[in-house]
Every structure is written in C-alpha cells, then in structure tokens.
Amino acid sequence: MTNIRKTHPLTKIINHSFIDLPTPSNISSWWNFGSLLGLCLVIQIMTGLFLAMHYTPDTTTAFSSVTHICRDVNYGWMIRYLHANGASMFFMCLFIHIGRGIYYGSFTFLETWNIGIMLLFTVMATAFMGYVLPWGQMSFWGATVITNLLSAIPYIGTNLVEWIWGGFSVDKATLTRFFAFHFILPFIITALTAIHLLFLHESGSNNPSGMTSDSDKIPFHPYYTLKDILGVIALLITLSTLVLFSPDLLGDPDNYTPANPLNTPPHIKPEWYFLFAYAILRSIPNKLGGVLALISSILILALMPFLNMAKQRSMMFRPLSQCLFWTLVANLMVLTWIGGQPVENPFIIIGQLASIMYFSTILIFMPLTNLLENKLLKW
C-alpha cells in the first residue's frame, strides 16, 4: 500500500515542501530565519484578525478603539502588543534573512531573490499602513510626511498624493483605505511567499560553502523540522519577553497622544525598522533626490546578482569580502541611529557620510574586492 502522504494531491505538496524535501546537510542556523518569517506572518495575521474585530477605522474613534482593546477586551493588551512587537520581530528576521542571502551568495537564485525583494517592499508597505491605524500623533504625521514624498514626482505628484489621501489632507478617507490595504496585503504576502518557496524548491537550498550539494542531501524532516523548532522557541521567548516586560520599548511615546493636525511633533520619525531608509532620505537636501535615494536603498538589492564578480559564491572563504560585509552591517546600524536623531549637526553630516558609504560599498567596493580576491586566488 502506497503512503497517502506521497500520493494524495494535497499532502503530496506538503510532503515535497516540508517533509521529504532534499536539503543540504551542512546548512547552519542562519537558514532558520525563513521558517521564522513564516511563523511571524502567521502570528501577525492571527493577532491582526482579532484586532480588526474591535478596531474602528474612523478618525473620531480609531484612537479610542485601540484604547478600548487594551483596557476592555480580554487579553486585548496582549494581542495588541503581540501585533506591534511581532512586526519588529518580523523585520529583525527579515534583515537577518537578507543578510544571510548576501553573505552566502543566495542572490544567484534570481527568481527567488527578486520575489524576495517584492516581498520586502510589500511587508514595508503593510507595516507603514499599520503604523497609521492607531491614529496617534506619530501615526498622523508619519502618514502625512511619507505620502507627501510622492508630490516630488514631476507633473503627476500633487494629484497622486491627493488621490492617495482621498482629499486635500490625511483624513477619514485615508485612514479607511489604509485599513483596507493593511488587511488585504498580508494575504498577498502569503501568496508571494508560496511563489518564493516554489522557486527556491526548483533550485534547492544554497549552503554555507556555496558549492553544489547534490551528492550530500538529507530529508528536511526530522532533521531541519527539529532544528527549526529551536529557532521557533527562541523567537517566541524573545517576543513574549518583549510583550510582557517592555511592550513599549520599540514604540514612540508620541503615539499615545491622539492625532492633532494643528500640532506638529518636534521630531517626526518612523518605527526603528525604517530608520536606515529614513536617514538616507533625509541626507539629501533635494526632495526628489531624497525619494530616489530612499527607493534605491532597497532596489539596490536587485543589482547584487549583476554586481557580483566573485568566482566563489559564498563569502565563507573570502576574508576581504567578509570585512566589507560587516562594515556594511555596521554602516546600516549607524544609519538606523541617525534616522532617530534630530536634523542638526553633527547628525546631518554623519548621515550623509553613512549614506555615501552604504551605496559605494555595494556599488563600488564589493565588486572591486571580488575582482581582487579572484586575482589573489589566480582566477
């Protein structure tokens, strides 16, 4: 009798993706973050669904409804903070996942990499719209500032901004449509994730050595299911600690003040996971230039497969590239810090230098280092 797991049309898909999937035997814990991102997505959809049951997308009651969730709904405070801090964990895993892809040369899987970039943009859009929903001061002014950036587009900019706002300022129409998009986008993310996995399983996973591992594969279950569970436990402990002990650690105190169009906060800043891009945006004095730099800071990832000159796929055996990679990581941390600082010296010049360093590392130094390493290895 044949195993139903291998023959039934539904279980066959699950079997080929998560059970009998041939996986390289040497992949490290850096490969855990894909499954952790899946877990984060599930947590966000579930907590988001329960929040949507009590939330009202109306400018007069949105702030009160979030307060009502925290005070009157059973474990509403926990659901709300799981959702808010779950987004932070999502981005933490996302950044590590992308970093691993760069370090071990996974960007050579073109389709998987490009769908990953689309996923990054979609997740960023979802998080931005979610931040607007509590309708606090930072929600309102964040929405105003970021949507206003589109007015830098020549000819159609102003019309485009008013079209997105649904009026002449951020108001009820904006909040309602942001709620609608924030609700639908996670399901689009889920669909894109399925396509991401589909393309990944066409080529098979990369591994730390960067070499083909066809001769040395093991089944995903039980080896990597067990290994992933360890990551899941670590993630849940971190998230629970954050939610139960310091739920507002990563938030902004200004968002506990109801939105007031007549009072601008002294310092408008997004959540921590957008600060690096916000710092790049602010480092250019020109509005259109800043917007282009902001988009380029993410889109530059799409150029990585074409800028790669190395004969070895992984950075595992390339110490010069490793130094450059960790310099890039440190640079992104500096940008994140600068994004949260006021626009004054010395922060302005540090932000500008860090932005130049970010783009030149990826566009100039990395390809040159690749060529130098090829030369040193007589390739």
Swiss-Prot record:
Positions that bind a ubiquinone: 201
Cofactor list: heme b
Cofactor note: Binds 2 heme b groups non-covalently.
Domain of life of the source: Eukaryota
GO MF annotations, alphabetized: metal ion binding; ubiquinol-cytochrome-c reductase activity
Topological type in the membrane: Multi-pass membrane protein
GO CC annotation: mitochondrial inner membrane; respiratory chain complex III
Record keyword Heme present: yes
Annotated CDD domains: cytochrome_b_C, Cytochrome_b_N
Residues that hold heme b b562 according to the record: 83, 182
Cell compartments where the protein resides: Mitochondrion inner membrane
PROSITE patterns the record matches: CYTB_CTER (PS51003), CYTB_NTER (PS51002)
Keywords of the record: Electron transport, Heme, Iron, Membrane, Metal-binding, Mitochondrion, Mitochondrion inner membrane, Respiratory chain, Transmembrane, Transmembrane helix, Transport, Ubiquinone
Keyword Cell division: no
GO BP, sorted A to Z: mitochondrial electron transport, ubiquinol to cytochrome c
Annotated binding of heme b b566, by residue: 97, 196
Residue ranges crossing the lipid bilayer per the database entry: 33-53, 77-98, 113-133, 178-198, 226-246, 288-308, 320-340, 347-367
Function: Component of the ubiquinol-cytochrome c reductase complex (complex III or cytochrome b-c1 complex) that is part of the mitochondrial respiratory chain. The b-c1 complex mediates electron transfer from ubiquinol to cytochrome c. Contributes to the generation of a proton gradient across the mitochondrial membrane that is then used for ATP synthesis.
Family: Belongs to the cytochrome b family.
Misc note: Heme 1 (or BL or b562) is low-potential and absorbs at about 562 nm, and heme 2 (or BH or b566) is high-potential and absorbs at about 566 nm.
Quaternary structure and interacting proteins, as annotated: The cytochrome bc1 complex contains 11 subunits: 3 respiratory subunits (MT-CYB, CYC1 and UQCRFS1), 2 core proteins (UQCRC1 and UQCRC2) and 6 low-molecular weight proteins (UQCRH/QCR6, UQCRB/QCR7, UQCRQ/QCR8, UQCR10/QCR9, UQCR11/QCR10 and a cleavage product of UQCRFS1). This cytochrome bc1 complex then forms a dimer.
Protein name, per record: Cytochrome b
Record organism: Loris tardigradus (Slender loris)
Lineage: Eukaryota, Metazoa, Chordata, Craniata, Vertebrata
